[in-house]
Amino acid sequence: MLSLVQKIIGSRNERFIKKVSRIVQKINSLEPEFEKLSDEQLKAKTFEYRERLANGEILDNLLPEAFATVREAGKRTKNMRHYDVQLIGGIVLHQGKVAEMKTGEGKTLVATLPAYLNALTGDGVHVITVNDYLAKRDAELMSDIYEFLGMSVGVIVADLNPQQRKEAYACDITYGTNNEFGFDYLRDNMAYEKEQQVQRSRNYVIIDEVDSILIDEARTPLIISGASDDSSEMYNLFNRLVPYLEKQEKEEVENEQEQRDFYVDEKSKNAYLTEKGYAKIENMLKKEGILEEDDNLYSPHNITKMHYLNACLRAHSLYQLNIDYIVRDQEIVIIDESTGRAMPGRRWSDGLHQAIEAKEGVKINAENQTMASITFQNFFKLYNKIAGMTGTADTEAFELHSIYGLEVIIIPTNKPMIRKDHHDEIYGSVREKFDAIVEDIKERISKGQPVLVGTASIEASEVLSTLLKKKKIRHNVLNAKQHEKEASIIAMAGYPDNVTIATNMAGRGTDIILGGNLEVEIAQLEDPTPEDIAQIKAEWLKRNEAVKKAGGLCIIGSERHDSRRIDNQLRGRAARQGDPGESKFYLSMDDNLLRIFASQSMAERVKKGLKGGESLAFGFMSKVISKAQGKVESYHFDIRKNLLEYDNVVNTQRKVIYEQRQSFLEAEDVSDILADIRIDVAEQLFHDYVSAGSMHELWDLEGLEKALKSDFMIELDLQKLYEEDDSLGEEDLKRLVREAIEIEFVEKTKNLDSGAVRQFEKFSLLQSLDTHWREHLSSIDHLRNSINLRGYAQKDPKNEYKKEAFELFSTMLDNFKYEVISSLAKIRIATEEETQRAQQEWQESMSDIKAEHESVIDNNQRHDEDEQEEAPKVQQVRREGPKVKRNDPCPCGSGKKYKQCHGKVE
């Protein structure tokens, strides 16, 4: 019934395309009129549109004219005319949706339409790509169009200094990577002067490869961190001990004889010790003198040892050289499992990177303490409007809509897509599969057909390369080890009988043109004459026709990826813009996807039914594969959804802190803010020693006096005052405490330079807030890591997490207020030498931060010398008494820690 209705009225996607086609017709009707305009008249349109917006007109009304303007500018500056389907894509992006556009349909050109329209408001447009190369390339390619129309274009890449970043963000349209935009947001919320902040409002963002950024990278938050204590000795110790542990093939074993020391869960990439393993590692640690004879690993004080052990166990059992990482220049370089790209400068978290460094015998770098963090899910929600482009979003439409509120619209291709997708072939073993791939390649290149082979790992690409060399088949390899040659390898991939092996082509961002890349060939000529160019074009046309006759580019997948989307991205490299093409996947029952997620009984039946070299290729197996991929996709979706639910708790707190911090930063004078905080602190302090409505006999006036003296440098004899006038009630005493704190502060600062005092007040607020927020993030991390244990007590971990996170946040805010007022109570005029020393120490402490993408760290830091020169000048003020830390003995002499005595907030 549903299919019948769809045939009559069309699907939702078809109805949407039909609706926006009317807008496209209007844009097309304007083309003759805009073609008649002079360059100056066309350029003047930008000023006209901005005036109309200022007078109350809305962007939707301007859209047809603005798109017609960009189309005409594209024709004049780039000799590129936006097709009708590209106009549809632009409308989809303007409306805050995801446009699924096949490879070769010109997504880079499409982005110019909504980018120009939305930049007319003056609030800026961000265009996000997956790497620096694509950001630079796209900005350079499209800058002629934007600049012709009077729009400024900026690019954010890793090596820019703060001033260059600020200038790039001030442009009408700014290109850059998701990591750079996210890290700049976090750094801006760590700045100590307004001038150090580089970003402006987050108005409208267009995300290229939106599925890769919002889904593949959503599980790993962006983190700004600073180095913590050196723990290389412990990693080296456990790295030496872990190889003595034996692996158990599955979690449950039938008898004790089969039990080993640990087992792994490949789905979640975790390793777990058995009871036998715990006993074995405890004995080894006791022999090493790390554990006492009567001690055990379950003890709370050994939690850090368990951290090192688990990290090393995962490093040895789950992460493999040339598959998950490579060693380059004595450093561990992560390989992105989705794209196959090496990611230099990035690091795994939770001690895993240090454990792998120990495993491979390279220098172990210190772990890091979180100073600021955010997930991509919550970062992009900060924008007023989000839009995205990709070649493969439909399979992830549910997640994009449920988490980001983004609707996916499939854009028709400009020319019909004629790729031929063959059935998968499944073999009993990996070797048989690779032999079949080699024979297929041999047959295809014999007729001049170019072949692109997609592999899931560097190891697989090198195995296949070795087999091809034995057969004397010429080929190129593109993986994380050959990343420098990427552009030239891709440019050659469409040549007749060319063979290219690539590790996960997803996100490569370069079209493979049949016959080779003509533009690259022309660019390589030195001072070419028109005759040279004509000859190159003629030769290219011959090659192009020859490849088309041979069947176009053939895509061969050496195994199925966990996600159907990544497989579709690989397939999408063939048959661009109406060209012919083919695709085929070769699998074995030993491939990770089928081994981990297909049922064991089915796998055994298939293996028994296959004789040496035989394969299966029919619909039933396609269903099995799709079902296995569906399991993986569902599993990963649940992880991302779960991460978001937990991060939303911290995100609410982050918004409060960052908004409060920004108000401190922008205020010229924070004295009114501090006056309000002093009232809160006086109230808090008073009720620590005098419970509301309690009897006089229960008042601890002596303790209150000691706290006033040690924390606020105030001598106030409350007991004497009460003895002299026993009519003084609770409210009277509270007022005396409040007035004493206020008067003492006025007296302390009345003879100081007011500018220096105001500067120090702001600095103290920001520094104290940052310190407490950083400690709070650490507490939240510990809470998050342990909260699932509450399930054993029949409690809902998420509800417990929300409740305790709120309590931690409330306590953190109270402690922040108390400490900042206590700090300000101890200031005095400092010498010039002391001022310089304090300033230098602060600059050094802030120059050591790193930007991480949890699995991943970006070491391109923005805290260079230019920024340090702008650090807050803490002139003429310093503490009079020593700062009391929360874990120090309380100065009152009780013997308790400060946080449990006078630093305690009920």
Curated annotation (Swiss-Prot):
This is Protein translocase subunit SecA. GO terms for cellular component: cell envelope Sec protein transport complex; cytosol; plasma membrane. InterPro entries: Helicase_ATP-bd, Helicase_C-like, P-loop_NTPase, SEC_C_motif, SecA, SecA_CS, SecA_DEAD, SecA_motor_DEAD. Residues 853-865, 877-888 have a biased composition (Basic and acidic residues). It comes from the Bacteria. Keywords: ATP-binding, Cell inner membrane, Cell membrane, Cytoplasm, Membrane, Metal-binding, Nucleotide-binding, Protein transport, Translocase, Translocation, Transport, Zinc. Pfam families: P-loop_SecA, SEC-C, SecA_DEAD, SecA_PP_bind, SecA_SW. ATP binds at residues 86, 104-108, 511. PROSITE patterns: SECA (PS01312), SECA_MOTOR_DEAD (PS51196). One of its GO terms (molecular function) is protein-exporting ATPase activity. Residues 853-906 are annotated as: Disordered. Its EC number is 7.4.2.8. Belongs to the SecA family. Zn(2+) binds at residues 890, 892, 901-902. Monomer and homodimer. Part of the essential Sec protein translocation apparatus which comprises SecA, SecYEG and auxiliary proteins SecDF-YajC and YidC. May bind 1 zinc ion per subunit. PANTHER family: CHLOROPLAST PROTEIN-TRANSPORTING ATPASE, SECA INNER MEMBRANE COMPONENT OF SEC PROTEIN SECRETION SYSTEM. CDD domains: DEXDc_SecA, SF2_C_secA. Part of the Sec protein translocase complex. Interacts with the SecYEG preprotein conducting channel. Has a central role in coupling the hydrolysis of ATP to the transfer of proteins into and across the cell membrane, serving both as a receptor for the preprotein-SecB complex and as an ATP-driven molecular motor driving the stepwise translocation of polypeptide chains across the membrane. GO terms for biological process: intracellular protein transmembrane transport; protein import; protein targeting; protein transport by the Sec complex. Gene3D superfamilies: Helical scaffold and wing domains of SecA, P-loop containing nucleotide triphosphate hydrolases, SecA, preprotein cross-linking domain. It catalyses: ATP + H2O + cellular proteinSide 1 = ADP + phosphate + cellular proteinSide 2. It is a peripheral membrane protein. Residues 896-906 have a biased composition (Basic residues).
